[in-house]
Amino acid sequence: MPTARIILAAAVVATTVAAPAASASTAAPNVTALKNVLLVGNSQSGSVSFIDENGFASLGSFNVIPDLQQRINEMDPIQRIGYEITKGIEGGDRFVDDASLSPDGRRLYVSRGNLDDVAAFDLAGKQELWHTRLDGFHADHAALSPDGTRFVVSATTANKAEFIDTATGAIVSSAPTGNYPHQNDYSADGKYVYNSSIGDVSLPQSLEWAKGAFQLTKIDAATMQVVKTWTLPHGIRPNLIAPDGNTFYAELSYLNGFVKYDLNAGKIVATVNQPFSEQAKTLKPDNYPKNSAHHGLALSGDGSTLCDVGTIDDYVALVSTDGLVDRAFVNYPTGSLPYWGQTSANGNYCYVSLSQANAVSVVDYHTGTEVARVPVGTFPQRERVSKVDPAVLGSLS
């Protein structure tokens, strides 16, 4: 087992930092006054970009690591070792893993990757309200509850999803997951959280058996208890549940495509193998970015088209859900590293983060073409559609 894995396994301890209390806004938001925006987490530059969904103009960005040096200085020796090892595994600094806006559009919640914490910011005042360290050494994907009171984040090396009170930053509960939990999503009705795990990505493909459980975990959002689990044959990468509540689409580690999975039957019912680009053909599986051939999956608003992001292929494939047939491809320059897909609020566009190009590509589901490309910060990854209070936009840089 790699030295990094041994140290991390031995050093996983409870390291949650008590956060200062901050009262949550109790006033109901004036939803009609809020503005539809796309949040883009710029992982290396430690900022979140705001893109206007009406016209795709950049509205600016917000610095979410104003306390970077302080946070590093606060680390004890074990935490600092974990930070450096995780930084190596991630391929460098990764300060923004995920982000969400509060229902009133005035607070920004951020999962801060290699800092292994979650922070809340008052946008208007440009003030950090609290930060809370998670168990383990890396804060991963996150999801905000529909009512805005809970922010659930994957504590990657601790193999748990931790639920945070957004008013105070306190960790109120956690749920066990598979090995190296990754994505979190609330169900459409808000009753459940679905967490998926990817396994230890530092191990080579030949040791896939040692990567741990590749598990989809269904958690009751009210009790924060696990109600059901499913095991898949490979690490579960970007995924989504169709409106029928049973059809699960997922990209898997090493698969140049995705699978369709029946949750009720507990089995894969279809596998879509996508074409390799010329550059991708030269890569060995152990050279895929953290085991991912494809890393980004979204569904059009009408449910007719999947946006399958070909990370090693430098393209996006638009795939019909009826028959799982490729309908169109949008190709990017070699080395663009498309790394996430997110459907627009109106359901008509797929936003694709181009991590190495420092931009977001806007793809029209209906025409199968790129209609805009928006410059953002350094190494964009996660994108989230949100609503912001226009009054706070003046705080953006």
Question: Residue locations for each model-derived region?
Answer:
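Secretory targeting and sorting signals
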Residues: M1-A24
